[in-house]
Amino acid sequence: MFERNEKTIFVLDHTRYFSISSEQYISMDYLKGKPMPAETPAAGSSVGTQLSKSLWTCAVESSIEYCRIVWDLFPGRKHVRFIVSDTAAHIVNTWSPSTQNMSHVSNAMMMVSVPSRSIPQSSDYSVIHGLRAAIEALAEPTDEQLQAAQVGCKKISNEGRVICITSARDNTSMKSLEDIFNTVLLQQNALVGPPGKKGLSIDHCHLVILNIVPLGVESLVTNRSLLEISPLLDVEIHTVHAPNISDKLLHLIMGHYDLASTTVTNIPMKEEQNANSSANYDVEILHARAAHTKVCGPDFTLTTSIKPGTSYETVTLKWCTPRGCGSSDLQPCVGQYNVTPVDVTSRPSSCLINFLLNGRSVLLEVPRKTGTKTTSHMLSARGGEIFVHSLSIARSAMDEAPSITDGPGGRVADYRIPELGQLLKMSRMVPLKAKPKGKMSQGEHLWRRLPRYFPRTMNVTILFNLQRQLSWLPHFLHLLVKEDMDKQDEVRCQQQIHELYKSASRGDMLPFTNTNNTRPKMSKTKDQYRLFYRELEQLIQLNVQTVHHKNLLESLQSLRAAYGDVTNKSEPGAAHLRSYTESPLSPERLEPNSTSSSSNSLLKASKRRMSSSGQRSLLDMISSAERSQSSKRLDFTGRLCTPIGQTAKLYPDFGNKDKDILTPGVIPSNLKDDSIRS
């Protein structure tokens, strides 16, 4: 219910060390005609008028910027508190909504001011006071948690994050800080339990320690990624130079609140010096990451890049020139999210914010080198807040779900949907009050047997295509799947099979409806009957339950043999395997022992058609490529000299001492006539 980023507490070290300079100097020489220094001069340089921020100023500015982003994107939903630590912990604000604003925090920080350098070095000045107060603040409930308790919520989750900005000497001091924080956390949870019951227990805490040092100073504290100290505490450590603390917190906040960065490019703005000309500027904004994931969908991704000087990715979108468009040109909105600029004080950001707050809207498009423009987002303001709207550039969210007929291989419109519905009704199972006897119940047996053979589309079956044209076929198929077929049913099926054989002998066509009023050739008619017999045999094989089924199967196989479509019985299980693997309309498979002239003619005809049409199989292409490559290389001499069936021996004289002592370049006469032996 309450996430970890619901509560965030900044603990700022207000000791004497934070009064020193950050060693980043800013030139104050604004006189015209004087060039700016090319490099930042060192401390004590006499070039121009310069100033430098203290470590305390860098820490306060960056932490306030952190909470500004949080309150802009999550107004009233996420809470940030500040605690200043020196000789004691000073609470800057509380969880109350009246203190969760920029004005209150800024005024309080002005009253704290920079630590004095005249403060004597003492152990009373420590950041530990602030960390203790931060743990106590995490145990205090927010207004939302109090409301959840009032409505009777038994378990209220209470997690939080503590960001401590301090400076430590080495890893040992940092380890001591972690141990003290973990100990105080356990003590605080012990206090809230019975019988004290003070506040909420802390389920988990994420401690982020930022070790701040001046520019150019090397720290003995090493960086460390997220590490689990205890089931209640995770700690990560970052050593940062004081001028870079804002960039580090900006990078951290994107992970803390699942944010994403978008850079709006090519924003036309009037120049201050020349109102008649304009230049293009870029503005970086932050928003929830879902603004990018929702707009893309599973089949589209936005291009990202790493902005110079930063370590996070940003999505680049172009400013789209406003133009008149109708409702049909607008994409549906799939989500809206609050937006805040990264650099709120820059002139381009200020111009964009004022432009939006004045009631204007901005369309953003995905930059493309070629093709049409794709508008993916829209910026607009309502009620003093700026939102980014995610526009659907994939399949519209308001469109109906994709039809079952829209397959990857093209539109398929001949699914046997009514037959599938009947199969589902026949296979429907309901729970029984008593457990049936035997290994398999009757319902489970039926459920396993019925869908063994079910063509999904009409273009892969001949048998089920003829049900409407042959009046006897539906009843015939019903008798085939009966488990209790009797002798009378067998006789009826035998009669229908013999009638079908007589029609094939006379050369009658099968009554297909899509013959386009043209009589098929005799060879095509035979192929249709042959496929019909094969599919019928496959159906009977999968439903053999009684002796009558077996007699019917043997009768059909004898008819297939008489018709020239013999099944090879020398291969065990070959017919049963084909019943599962072969499609009724698959190409004719010839058996090795078949002597049918019609089968041979079909095979020769298919070969002629393939050779005449120029079609080649994958094996032919691979073999041809291998032969062409092999012809360019000389074969191994030993293989050429070795008789067929034997293996050539590599280095036949290797290890022969008599041959090793021969003079180099002299070949004995007895070796000239010997060939390489295997």
UniProtKB/Swiss-Prot annotation:
Function: Component of the integrator complex, a multiprotein complex that terminates RNA polymerase II (Pol II) transcription in the promoter-proximal region of genes. The integrator complex provides a quality checkpoint during transcription elongation by driving premature transcription termination of transcripts that are unfavorably configured for transcriptional elongation: the complex terminates transcription by (1) catalyzing dephosphorylation of the C-terminal domain (CTD) of Pol II subunit Polr2A/Rbp1 and Spt5, and (2) degrading the exiting nascent RNA transcript via endonuclease activity.
Subcellular location: Nucleus; Cytoplasm; Cytoplasm, Perinuclear region
Matching InterPro entries: Cell_cycle_regulator_Mat89Bb
Pfam family, one: Mat89Bb
Keyword Cell wall biogenesis/degradation: no
Cysteine pairs bridged by disulfides in the record: none
Homology family: Belongs to the Integrator subunit 13 family.
One example of a Gene Ontology biological process annotation: regulation of mitotic cell cycle
Gene, per the UniProt record: asun
Keywords, in A-Z order: Cell cycle, Cell division, Coiled coil, Cytoplasm, Developmental protein, Differentiation, Meiosis, Mitosis, Nucleus, Phosphoprotein, Spermatogenesis
PTM (free text): Phosphorylated.
Quaternary structure (record): Belongs to the multiprotein complex Integrator, at least composed of IntS1, IntS2, IntS3, IntS4, omd/IntS5, IntS6, defl/IntS7, IntS8, IntS9, IntS10, IntS11, IntS12, asun/IntS13, IntS14 and IntS15. The core complex associates with protein phosphatase 2A subunits mts/PP2A and Pp2A-29B, to form the Integrator-PP2A (INTAC) complex.
Record's GO cellular component terms: cytoplasm; INTAC complex; integrator complex; nucleus; perinuclear region of cytoplasm
Primary site of residence: nucleus
Species: Drosophila grimshawi (Hawaiian fruit fly)
The protein's name: Protein asunder
Segments carrying motif Nuclear localization signal (NLS): 603-609
Coiled coil: none
Domain of life: Eukaryota
Region (Disordered): 570-626, 652-678
Compositional bias annotation for Low complexity: 593-604
